[in-house]
Each structure stands twice: as C-alpha cells, then as structure tokens.
C-alpha cells in the first residue's frame, strides 16, 4: 500500500500534477528545494534512485537497501502525510498518466488563450499613466514583508543558484522570542485538528470554516483543504497536538522553528502549499456578482485594467459594461462606443462599449495634452474683414463677419458649404441649434436661416438699433439691442412675443433659460425678467461701470464689468452673494459650469473661481501667460483653453492651473496678429484669426485631436 502511494507520488512530482489545479506561482519544485537545503550524500542517492525507479514504472521501496530500510519506512509515512492527493487503489498508473496528459494539454490551450487576452489588456493598460506602478510594487513588497508570507520561489533564479545562498540557507535566523512568554492576541484562531478516524482516503476538515478555502467550500464554490488520512497516525500524535495547543504563542513559534529545521524538502514544500494560499485570498470570487462589481467600482480605471489581468473571473468582472458606464458618467461621457472588432471575441468575454468609450476619451485627452500638433485645416473667407461671431456644432462651423455675411463650413473637409447673404450691415451676433442659424446685425434685424439650404426663413423686425447680443433656448430667442430693449421671438413663426423695457443704455449681454431672462447693459445694471409678464423681477445694482459679460445657471447670476469686479448674485432674492476681485481691467469673457467660473480679462490673466465660496482657486499666469488681453475662453472638466490679442491659443490644466502648451501660435503674434474667437468640441478646436493692421490674413483654423479606435 505504502509502496503504491510512493509510486503515484513520484509520478505526480514528475508531471507536476495536483488535484489543487491552480497552484500558487510561488510554489517551488523539488529540484529547487534540493539546491536550497543541503542533504547528506546517502539521502541524495536514495532520492535519485526513487525517481529513476518511478520513471520505469516500478514500485519504489520494494527492495530497500538494508542500511536505509528504517529511513525508507519513515519516508513513506512522511510522503503520504505531505500529499494532497487521493489514491484509488483500483486505478492503474497508466490510466492516471493518460488523464494527466489530457489535463496538461487542456492547460496548454488555456495558457495560449490567456496570452492572447493579456496582449489585449496590455494594450489597454498602455493607454493609462503607469506612474503609479512602482508605488504599487513597493506596497506589495511591504505587505509581503509584514505578513511574512514570502517563499523561496519568490527569489530570482540566479540568487537561488548562488553558492553563497546555498551555503548560508541552513543558517536560518530563528525567531527571537525573548525572555518574556506572551500569548497571541485573542483574535488569533487555534489550529484545526484533523479527523484521523475516517476510513476514506481524504476527508475535509471538520472545524468551523476559518480560511479562504473553507469559505469557498461553505458557499459551494470550492473544496475545503483535504488532509491525508490513509495512513495510521503515529503514536502520540494527539497527545503532542494537545500539548502544542497548551503552549503560549511564543512557545509555539519556537516549536515551529525547530520543526521546520528537522523537515525534508518535500515536507517544506507541503507546508508552503498549505500556508501560502491563506495569504492569497481572492475575496472577490466569494461575493455575489453585484457586490463584487460594487467593490470594483471604487477602483480607478487604470487599476481596473490591472485587476483584469489577475485571473479570468476578475477580467469578466472588470469588463462589465455597467461598471464602465458608471466610470463614463463620472467623466461626462454620454454615449457608448461601438467599434468593429478585428478578431472574434472568445465566449465569456463580452466586449464593453462603455469601456471602449472611456479608453477613447482618455486617448483624446492625451492628444490634447501632448499629442503631435498636426497642421491645422485652414478655412479662408471673409477677405480681410473681422470675424465677429463664431458657432461650432457637430461638424458644422458658422462664422459671422462685419462683411454682412455668414459662412457655413464643414469641420471635416474644411470646405465652405454655403454663404448666407441678406443682411445689409455687419453681423455682430449669432446662435445655432441643429439646422437653424440665427443672426443679428447692425441693420437692426434678426434673420433665421436654414443651415442645410442657406435659405432665409424669417427676417425679424422690431429693434431700432444694432442687435448686439442674443440667446437661443429651444424655439425662442431673446435679443438685446443698443436701443436699450430686449425682445423675445418665436423662431418658427417669426413673431415678436414680448418686449422687455427698463434699461436706459445699450444692452450688451443676455442669458435665457426658458423661464427667466437676465440682461447686462451699459447703464451699470443687471436685470432679471419674467418674459411672460414682461416685468422686471430684480434690478441688481452694485457695478460702477458698464456690464460686458454674463453667465446664468438658473440659480446664480454672474456679471463681469469694466469696473474690474465680478459679482455673483442670487437670482431668487436679487442679493449679491460674492464680489470677486483680483482682475485689473475689463472682464471680457466668462464661462460657468457646476459652480466653477473661469474668467478672462483684458489684464492678460485668467482666473478660476468657486462661486459657492467666492474663492479664487487658480490664476493662470506665470512665464507662459498671455502677453495681451484675453479675447475668448472655454473649459471642460480637465482643461481651460484661452485665446488672446497676442496671437496665441493656450491650454491649461483646470485643477492645477498649470500651463500645458500652446495650441496655436501666429507668426504675426505680437505685431498685429489676433485670435478673435475660439470654439472647441471634445475632439476639435476652431479658431478665428486675423489682424487689425493687415499683418495676418482672416481665416479659420481647425485642429483635430480625435483618435482612431479599431
């Protein structure tokens, strides 16, 4: 019986077979252990003879040498006590070898599939900043040292084979237990006692599950650690175990030190097989899928990609479409990305459109930051006139000029699709939604255009001076004029629905959210209107000079003035909440999103504010700041884009305020070249450039930062 066990054990060693299936990568083979722990020559010869005999299909130990008979019997008991295999005495060695060959063939196929999957994951991981990898490795090393669970196999191969290491291995440092004998903390669980009375080959531990493997078994996801019970336990084992349990913690450690010193390599290997899985607990696999996904949702996307390379089950979780939809929602990504795959996806690994959308957006952001600046598309038009207004929606660009025309351009091809002719004065304001374009002119009219055909649908009469500003909301547009009035129009019928009168000077800026109208004028006033009743709800007084810019989010009104200040108002009460100071000149442009305000000033600086607290978060300045007045700006959750009279367009980091790089630098910058307007989408930047002295040709520049997802 013992001889058959040893024969099967030798075959298991030779093929690497184990019923545990997924063995820890830190387990070592017996060849490595033989190099690490020195053995006497007789013992080495005996192991070599056993392996040679096993290869020829003979029973090991049938004819032991007389001098080694006792050692052989003792080795048989140890071999059986240190194996995780269950022996069926009726099965033959050839049958087991055939089964294991099939098992290894299947494992080889799985490894090939995993290599292909890992290549794809590596490509995705490359898209993210790897700067945190070193810190994660340091953390892993630190944790390994704290738990004392590292093994010999974790060492590099050259270190294992080093003569110095081999000679010094057996001089293992013992635990310094000290003079005091103190027990472990109450949280330490006692060792489990095996049930040796069972007649079966292997039985599960009868104690309450306390390890990861036990928990898996309790949940029906795996088997508990099985113990070898096919051999009668040695006399006095139970008494020794009871005595061991009665010792204090340090005394147990001392006993374990001595026990390890007396073990052979195969016994040390067995201990590692038992101990190491306890420090590699995959708690994610224990949880229901919903809870596992909830836990993974707290990871950063780059960490999710790393987690996906842990194992197949983790990759299935990390590819979950709903998980990536939440990540996209956090980044403001509204649509999933459906791409054609070049290869067939293996069963069980479903492509995530939301994950693809997230990775695409990350690549686009990287292009904005440090991608190669390719030559922009140049859209020439309007001769040498000034481009006074600029709109960009989808793949369509609309530019208005003081040459009395508007032009519609393709952002993809750069071609002028049509020229909108009809105004008899310069165009100074415009709005666009879908296929509708609305323009305001010095000829005192507004016109509604069909962007597809270039047809003028309506001409809106009523103002008695230049239409200087407008704001479109759904089917209505509100216009402000130098005649000091505001008018509300229905763009479908062309009718003037309401006239708002109250300002005593030209209206310079207007905002409309569909319920209330907010206007700023040269009379230093900001007014809040109910357009349906044509009544002024609040007159916001405080500025000491002309109001040039406005922002309105439905709760707060933000006004910028020539008096250098910016004021934040409560739209319901009309009270001034904050006065933002710091700029030195006219605030010519502002943008407000989610309580974050970015303001551009004629003093060449840009500031980022929190309107809830009134605090200035960042001032975009320094050696790379603009050298002249800021003409236009736009921002998203990552970047701020600014243009200036100095002929440059600059990119800044919204959170840190750091300068990233110049996106546009005109050769005539500083000598007359000006960037008048900018408009940006997620992937494109449109700049209206020219000059006031003829040094720069009037044109549009289109820069593309999109990526190709194959």
UniProtKB/Swiss-Prot annotation:
Its main location: nucleus. Keywords: Biological rhythms, Chromosome, DNA damage, DNA repair, Nucleus, Phosphoprotein, Repeat, Ubl conjugation, Ubl conjugation pathway, WD repeat. Residues 69-84, 143-158 have a biased composition (Polar residues). The keyword Nucleus applies. It is found in: Nucleus, Nucleoplasm; Chromosome. Residues 87-132 have a biased composition (Acidic residues). The modification Phosphoserine is found at residues 26, 230. Residues 1-158 are annotated as: Disordered. WD repeats lie at residues 381-421, 423-459, 462-501, 503-539, 542-581, 583-621, 625-662. One of its GO terms (molecular function) is protein-macromolecule adaptor activity. GO terms for cellular component: chromosome; cytoplasm; endoplasmic reticulum; Golgi apparatus; membrane; mitochondrion; nucleolus; nucleus. Widely expressed with highest levels in brain, heart and testis. Pathway: Protein modification; protein ubiquitination. InterPro entries: F-box-like_dom_sf, F-box_dom, G-protein_beta_WD-40_rep, WD40/YVTN_repeat-like_dom_sf, WD40_repeat_CS, WD40_repeat_dom_sf, WD40_rpt. One of its GO terms (biological process) is Notch signaling pathway. Residues 46-55, 133-142 have a biased composition (Basic and acidic residues). The modification Phosphothreonine is found at residue 208. Disruption phenotype: Whole body FBW7 knockout is embryonic lethal. Conditional knockout mice in which FBW7 expression is specifically abolished in osteoclasts display severe bone resorption, bone fragility and low bone mass. Conditional knockout in liver reduces the amplitude of the diurnal expression of many core clock genes and the altered expression of a large number of genes controlling liver metabolic pathways. Residues 281-327 form the F-box domain. Substrate recognition component of a SCF (SKP1-CUL1-F-box protein) E3 ubiquitin-protein ligase complex which mediates the ubiquitination and subsequent proteasomal degradation of target proteins. Recognizes and binds phosphorylated sites/phosphodegrons within target proteins and thereafter brings them to the SCF complex for ubiquitination. Mediates ubiquitination and subsequent degradation of CCNE1 and MYC. Identified substrates include cyclin-E (CCNE1 or CCNE2), DISC1, JUN, MYC, NOTCH1 released notch intracellular domain (NICD), NOTCH2, MCL1, MLST8, RICTOR and probably PSEN1. The WD repeats mediate interaction with substrates of the SCF (SKP1-CUL1-F-box protein) E3 ubiquitin-protein ligase complex. Homodimer; homodimerization plays a role in substrate binding and/or ubiquitination and degradation. Component of the SCF(FBXW7) complex consisting of CUL1, RBX1, SKP1 and FBXW7. Interacts (via F-box domain) with SKP1. Interacts (via F-box domain) with pseudophosphatase STYX; the interaction is direct and prevents FBXW7 interaction with SKP1. Interacts with cyclin-E (CCNE1 or CCNE2). Interacts with PSEN1. Forms a trimeric complex with NOTCH1 and SGK1. Interacts with NOTCH1 intracellular domain/NICD and NOTCH4 intracellular domain/NICD. Interacts with NOTCH2 intracellular domain (N2ICD). This is F-box/WD repeat-containing protein 7. It comes from Mus musculus (Mouse). The gene is Fbxw7.
């Amino acid at each position: 019986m013992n001889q058959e066990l040893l024969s099967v054990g030798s075959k298991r060693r030779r093929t690497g077979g184990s019923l545990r299936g997924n063995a820890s990568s830190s387990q070592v083979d017996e060849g490595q252990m033989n190099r690490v722990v020195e053995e006497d020559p007789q013992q080495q010869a005996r192991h070599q003879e056993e392996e040679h005999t096993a290869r020829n299909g003979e029973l090991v130990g049938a004819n032991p040498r007389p001098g080694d008979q006792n050692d052989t019997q003792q080795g048989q008991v140890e071999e059986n006590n240190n194996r995780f295999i269950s022996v069926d005495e009726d099965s033959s060695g050839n049958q087991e070898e055939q089964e294991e060959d099939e098992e290894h063939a299947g494992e080889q196929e799985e490894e090939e599939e995993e290599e292909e999957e890992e290549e794809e994951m590596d490509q995705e991981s490359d898209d993210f900043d790897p700067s945190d990898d070193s810190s994660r490795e340091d953390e892993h090393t630190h944790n390994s040292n704290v738990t004392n669970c590292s093994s010999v196999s974790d060492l590099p191969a050259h270190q294992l084979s080093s003569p110095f290491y081999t000679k010094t291995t057996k001089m293992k440092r013992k635990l310094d237990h000290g003079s005091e004998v103190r027990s472990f903390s109450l949280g330490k669980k006692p060792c489990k006692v095996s049930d040796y009375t069972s007649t079966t080959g292997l039985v599960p531990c009868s104690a309450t599950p306390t390890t990861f493997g036990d928990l898996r078994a309790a949940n029906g996801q795996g088997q508990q650690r099985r113990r070898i019970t096919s051999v009668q336990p040695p006399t006095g084992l139970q008494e020794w175990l009871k005595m061991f349990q009665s010792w204090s913690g340090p005394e147990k450690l001392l006993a374990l030190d001595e026990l390890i010193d007396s073990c052979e390599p195969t016994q040390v290997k067995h201990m590692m097989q038992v101990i190491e899985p306890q420090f590699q607990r995959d708690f994610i696999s224990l949880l229901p899928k919903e809870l596992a996904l909830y836990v993974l949702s707290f990871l950063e996307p780059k960490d999710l990609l790393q987690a996906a390379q842990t194992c197949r089950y983790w990759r299935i979780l990390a590819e979950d479409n709903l998980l990536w939809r939440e990540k996209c929602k956090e980044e403001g990504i509204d649509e999933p990305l459906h791409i054609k795959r070049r290869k067939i996806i293996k069963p069980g690994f479903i492509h995530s459109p939301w994950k693809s959308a997230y990775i695409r957006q990350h690549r686009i952001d990287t292009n904005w930051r440090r991608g190669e600046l390719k030559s922009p598309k140049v859209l020439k038009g309007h001769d040498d006139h000034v481009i006074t207004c600029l709109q960009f929606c989808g793949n369509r660009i609309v530019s208005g000029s003081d040459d009395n025309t508007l032009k519609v351009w393709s952002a993809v091809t750069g071609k002028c699709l049509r020229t909108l002719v009809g105004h008899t004065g310069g165009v100074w304001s415009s709005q666009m939604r879908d296929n509708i374009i609305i323009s305001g002119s010095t000829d005192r009219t507004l016109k509604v255009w069909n962007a597809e055909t270039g047809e003028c649908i309506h001409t809106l009469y009523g103002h008695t001076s230049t239409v200087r500003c407008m704001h479109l909301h759904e089917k209505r547009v509100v216009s402000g004029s130098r005649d000091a009035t505001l008018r509300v129009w229905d763009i479908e019928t062309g009718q003037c629905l309401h006239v708002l009168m109250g300002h005593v000077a030209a209206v310079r800026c207007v905002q409309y959210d569909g319920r209330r109208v907010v206007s700023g004028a040269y009379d230093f006033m900001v007014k809040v209107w109910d357009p349906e009743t044509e009544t002024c709800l609040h007159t916001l007084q405080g500025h000491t000079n002309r109001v040039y810019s406005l922002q309105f989010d439905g709760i707060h009104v933000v006004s910028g003035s020539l008096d250098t200040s910016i004021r934040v108002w409560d739209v319901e009460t009309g009270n001034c909440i904050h006065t933002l100071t710091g700029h030195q000149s006219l605030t010519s442009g502002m943008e407000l999103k989610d309580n974050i305000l970015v303001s551009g000033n004629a003093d060449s600086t840009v500031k980022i504010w929190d309107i809830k607290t009134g605090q200035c978060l960042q001032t975009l300045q320094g050696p790379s700041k603009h050298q002249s007045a800021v003409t236009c700006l736009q921002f998203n959750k990552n970047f701020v884009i600014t243009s200036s009279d100095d002929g440059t367009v600059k990119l800044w980091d919204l959170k840190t305020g750091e300068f990233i790089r110049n996106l546009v630098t005109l050769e005539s910058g500083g000598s007359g070249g000006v960037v008048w307007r900018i408009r940006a989408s997620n992937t494109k930047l449109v700049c209206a450039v020219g000059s006031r002295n003829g040094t720069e040709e009037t044109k549009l520049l289109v820069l593309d930062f999109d990526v190709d997802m194959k």
